Amino acid sequence: MPEGVTVSEVSSPKDLKGFVELPYRLYAGDADFVPPLRSDVRWMLDPAKNPFWMHARRTLFLARRGDRVVGRIAAIADDEHNRVHADRTAFFGFFECENDPEAARALFAAAETAASTLLPGCDKLRGPVNPSMNDEVGFLIAAESEPGPPVLMMTYNPAYYLDLAAAAGFSKEKDLVALLAPVDDRSFARLGRITDAVRRRNPELTFRTIRMDDFPRELEKVKVVYNGAWENNWGFVPMTSEELDAMAKKLKDLIYPPIVWFVEKGDEPVAFMLGMPDFNQVLIRMGGRLFPFGWLKFLLGRKKVDRIRLLA
């Protein structure tokens, strides 16, 4: 007889370690899993470091069978989301679980109960978000072909997660679509023709790459365009200055300036395109650690990246 499922709140450094470490065991042997850096996961969860928690709260849970951790989940309340959307929606995130419907139901139930405490009057639980709508969002559902390893900042999970969520009473609320396009000389030429046509028809617009020597001001322009362009999109929550600053510190050494572009009308930014090398192609070989040898694998592998992640 299998031991029963128990769910408990993460309340000690040992529990937190179990929470962080679970995916590395669950996905062992999965050639498409990209292990996130453990330091990044801890940073995301840390209310003292991640500025998202300045306007949000969370409770973390572990599911066990005996001494074995079989699942995890976070209940999250984001005051900024509820201010913008004028609702009482809470979230779940960081969900990982063995193919164990009983454990999954217990985790979702714990998150629902915690959400009512974190957000009195809560009437909806949505997820996964890890930890916000500006981070990894949703379950991976399908791809036109074999999905392969995820691109930087994209979600990844086993197909059975959809069944676990459905068995616990969840249903799909929204499809979020990511597109993959091959790039070759013909596509570059076509993009060049489109850009030239836009310039001819709109001579008041200027196109330029990012000025890394004026990074703080450039970052403020990203914030203005991003929050303005996305404000009517489903589920959007504007990034605070603190969140944008934190993201910039993480990305500054990763972005490739020739593929970060601004479009301006006079002195006003009206569009941007942020291109980043898909460093997941390197992270997949690092085992979730920078030390002792992860940093060397990163330095040796970063120049071999042949895919770009675009945000615009």
Regions found by a protein language model. Give the residues of each.
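Flexible glycine/acidic-rich beta-alpha junction loops that bind and position SAM and/or redox cofactors
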Residues: P131-L140, D175, A181-P182, D278-I284
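Residue-level detector of conserved, well-ordered beta-strand and adjacent loop positions
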Residues: S8-S11, R64, G93, R208-R211, ...
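Acyl-donor binding region in acyl/amide transferases
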Residues: R83-G169, M286-A312
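Acyltransferase donor/substrate-recognition loop-hinge adjacent to the catalytic core
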Residues: E3-V5, T155-G235, I259
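Generic start-of-chain signal for non-secretory N-termini
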Residues: M1-D32
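A conserved beta-strand-loop-helix scaffold within acyl/acetyltransferase catalytic domains
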Residues: P23-R65, A75-R83, R217-L311
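Catalytic cores of nucleotide-enabled group-transfer and carboxylate-activating enzymes in metabolic
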Residues: P13-L16, E21, P35-S39, W43-P47, ...
